[in-house]
Amino acid sequence: MRLLAPIPVDRRPRRFVQLLAGLLLYGATMGMMVRAVLGLDPWDVFHQGVTAWINHWIPLSYGAVITIVSVVVLLLWIPLRQRPGIGTIANAAIIGFTTDATLAVLPTFTNLPTRIALMTMAIVGNAVAGALYIGAGLGPGPRDGLMTGLVARGVGSIRVVRTTIELTVLAVGWILGGVVGVGTVLYALAIGPLLHLLLPRLMVKSAVPQTVRVNRVPEAVGAGPSGTAGEIRGAAVVAAGQGDPNPHPRPEFHDPVAVDPDQIWEDGEGR
């Protein structure tokens, strides 16, 4: 059994460059949001709270905590039978380091207009970064893989599972000392529409037809994202490029997940 999901065979140079650019920018925008001190997205409230709590005993940087949490979340993939892609591993390894590097060079700002401008740039940049690395098609982030794994096991719909996870980490992070503020609300309102706008434009389209095995399908047209039918044996050939009825390919989930990727884009970032 393969430990990693297969890497798409076409356009690999562009995929890897786009993945690296997206992850570096993602970490930089996370550092910008911290310096804006206007509130963070739910997972980063959790990271910040854990950092504040654990530093009572062990001196760990914010970026180191991000990396540790990513590894712990990846371990939760095992019972869910999810396979990470190379992009998933790169996500866990790069973002925390880049966030720390950004915090090391970016000063703390006290002027409110400057902080608002910084937060605005961070949210827009974060959406661009997310669209870049998700669009590379090399695997979802650890946290989104946890979500889709739970959905595939029938725990609930994407909206229910994602909302439950994010409210939980937000509450725990806030209790531990993470910053919740107007930036948290702005991020929640803006990130979905921005990703929905950017992702089709940054998705790496396949240059050759691909064979895609479908393991689970909705029970019927209009079935909810958690509804599944029996396994289908066989493959479906999806043509990309000219003549493709869907010119914007969706993100590839290499494990059988009965979810609608559109909902992932609309609900938030792909980390």
Model-derived regions: residue spans:
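Core subunits and conserved enzymes of cellular information-processing
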Residues: 1-243, 247-270
